[in-house]
């Protein structure tokens, strides 16, 4: 696999070629795979990857009541959904779709999972965002902190995936470290590792793509 220095140079080029904006753009990578049959579920990637350098806009929702809600408030979780709200959202498909699209990670009390599956499964499932079950008594605070520095990779049946790896306000070295973390994790779950990766591109939201591999 490509070394961190080469990744960092590609990131620097992508940042330098990006049009000047008054806001922080996302920095994303596109990874194209090869020599792998994605029609076979065992070959598909579905991974949550912790990044060494997080960014501040990963939204997390917690579904439940009682102690899990208290903990969620302590770590400023972006959205808390109680059992009544779960049922209400089940009857509001447009609002439920918005929630499924806006929040990246979901945590839910294990006891709530049947309710979530019944009312929100059709919205969350296809996006790969069914909640992580949380047993009663588990401390969710460290989990939330870790997820805030994580990305979700999900290929379904396609030989390509895209993921955010930083923002234009981060140092190139930090973004390169995040890209390296993603690629190493993906290599570890691919049948032939590096040989299954055809190409990798990095770009800002509005900038041109720069080839890494």
Swiss-Prot record:
Entry's transmembrane regions: none
Any one GO molecular function term: rRNA binding
Pfam families assigned to the protein according to its UniProt record, in alphabetical order: Ribosomal_L1 (PF00687)
Cellular compartments per GO CC: large ribosomal subunit
Keywords for the protein's UniProt record, in alphabetical order: Repressor, Ribonucleoprotein, Ribosomal protein, RNA-binding, rRNA-binding, Translation regulation, tRNA-binding
Ribosomal protein keyword on record: yes
Subunit structure: Part of the 50S ribosomal subunit.
Sequence similarity: Belongs to the universal ribosomal protein uL1 family.
Official protein name in the record: Large ribosomal subunit protein uL1
Gene: rpl1
């Amino acid at each position: 696999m490509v070394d961190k220095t080469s990744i960092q140079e590609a990131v620097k080029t992508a940042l330098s070629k990006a049009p000047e904006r008054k806001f922080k753009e996302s920095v994303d990578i596109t990874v194209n795979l090869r020599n792998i049959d994605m029609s076979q579920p065992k070959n598909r990637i579905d991974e949550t990857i912790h990044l060494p350098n997080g960014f501040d806009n990963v939204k997390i929702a917690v579904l439940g009541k009682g102690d899990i809600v208290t903990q969620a408030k302590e770590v400023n979780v972006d959205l808390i959904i109680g059992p009544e709200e779960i049922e209400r959202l089940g009857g509001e498909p447009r609002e439920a779709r918005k929630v499924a699209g806006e929040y990246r990670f979901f945590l839910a009390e294990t006891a709530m999972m049947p309710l979530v599956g019944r009312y929100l499964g059709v919205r969350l499932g296809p996006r790969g965002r069914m909640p992580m079950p949380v047993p009663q008594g588990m401390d969710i605070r460290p989990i939330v902190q870790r997820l805030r520095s994580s990305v979700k990779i999900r290929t379904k049946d396609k030989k390509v995936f895209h993921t955010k790896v930083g923002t234009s306000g981060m140092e190139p070295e930090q973004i390169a470290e995040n890209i390296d973390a993603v690629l190493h994790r993906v290599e570890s779950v691919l049948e032939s590792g590096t040989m299954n990766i055809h190409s990798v591109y990095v770009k800002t939201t509005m900038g041109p793509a720069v080839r890494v591999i």
